[in-house]
Design a protein with these regions (language model features):
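Alpha-helical structural signal in soluble globular domains
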Residues: 49-57, 153, 182-186
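Metal-dependent phosphoester-hydrolase catalytic domains
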Residues: 83-89, 141, 145, 154-164, ...
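Active-site beta-strand/loop signature of hydrolases that rely on acidic residues for catalysis
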Residues: 2-8, 21-46, 78, 129-134, ...
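Structured beta-strand-rich core segments of catalytic domains in phosphoester-bond hydrolases
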Residues: 32, 36-127, 226-227
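Acidic-and-aromatic substrate-binding clefts and catalytic sites of carbohydrate-active enzymes
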Residues: 10-15, 39-43, 67-70, 139-141, ...
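Soluble or luminal CAZymes and related metallo-dependent hydrolases
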Residues: 12-17, 42-46, 113-117, 141-149, ...
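Short aromatic-enriched loop/helix-cap "lid" or pocket-rim segments at secondary-structure transitions
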Residues: 16-18, 45-48, 72-74, 101, ...
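Internal catalytic-core helix/loop-beta-alpha segment
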Residues: 109-124, 131, 136-140, 144, ...
Length: 245
């Protein structure tokens, strides 16, 4: 199972993204493509344009979370038929986490700024569940609560052999910061393994903002990125083999 997550920066360089998908071998045979900051160009969803470039065997779903400077900003999932046969995808709102669980300074900040609308896409089949997430830029404990909303949703669903949570966590700041360790502890407590933990940078600022988590039994994985200059984020890949040794 090959998974890629990529914040495509509102598709500002959509032609470069399409070129990469068509020409780079890393995208060949991709099973799941999780997109953040997907937009609409020429009346078409970015995900539709990218899926078309990937070939006839791909399907897509895109949902707008908010308008960013008047442009649609949302999440999308592209999947390869045969590798994944989901029912109709659903939206999980990440907009209203529990403020009472946050420090007072952070609660004050979040009330003062214009609210950000954030969502996760959930797609599932009897064999697999996938979440495409995009957490807020602002806030620390806020991000933990947004991610916890995904974890809570997953826990309420029937158990499946494989769950993938992938996306842009916006984890700006030193990787050893206590709050980022809290985020890592939250996912670990839920049985989610960060298969991209060895990757050092996923953004032009040289920070790691993007990740892929896996919840399963025994599995092996490897992860890598490409520096394509088609977005401010790098695409992040993981090959996951269930039952591997």
């Amino acid at each position: 199972m090959r998974v890629c997550t990529w914040n495509i920066q509102l598709g500002l360089k959509l032609d470069a993204i399409v070129h990469a998908v068509r020409t780079r071998p890393d995208f060949k045979g991709l099973d799941l493509f999780c997109l953040q900051e997907a937009s609409i160009h020429g009346g078409r969803d970015d995900a539709a344009v990218i899926a078309e470039a990937m070939g006839a065997g791909y399907r897509h779903f895109q949902a707008t979370a908010q308008l960013a400077r008047g442009q649609e900003q949302g999440n999308a999932l592209i999947w390869r038929r045969g590798a994944f046969e989901p029912t109709d995808p659903h939206i999980v709102s990440l907009t209203n986490p529990v403020l009472a669980k946050m420090p007072r300074v952070e609660r004050t900040l979040l009330r003062a700024i214009a609210p950000q609308q954030r969502i996760a896409i959930r797609a599932e089949s009897p064999a697999m569940r996938v979440y495409v997430v995009h957490l807020d830029v602002i806030g620390f404990a806020h991000k933990v609560e947004q991610l916890r909303a995904v974890i809570t949703d997953n826990a309420a669903r029937p158990r499946v052999p494989l769950t993938v949570v992938a996306g842009d966590l916006n984890t700006f700041g030193p990787p050893g910061l206590q709050l980022w360790r809290r985020l890592a502890a939250t996912t670990a407590d839920a049985g989610l393994v960060d298969v991209t933990r060895e990757i050092g940078r996923t953004h032009w600022t040289a920070q790691k903002l993007d990740a892929i988590f896996v919840q399963s039994g025994v599995f092996t994985s490897r992860a890598w990125t490409l520096d394509l200059h088609a977005s401010d984020h790098h695409p992040v890949f993981a090959d996951i083999e269930i039952g591997g040794a």
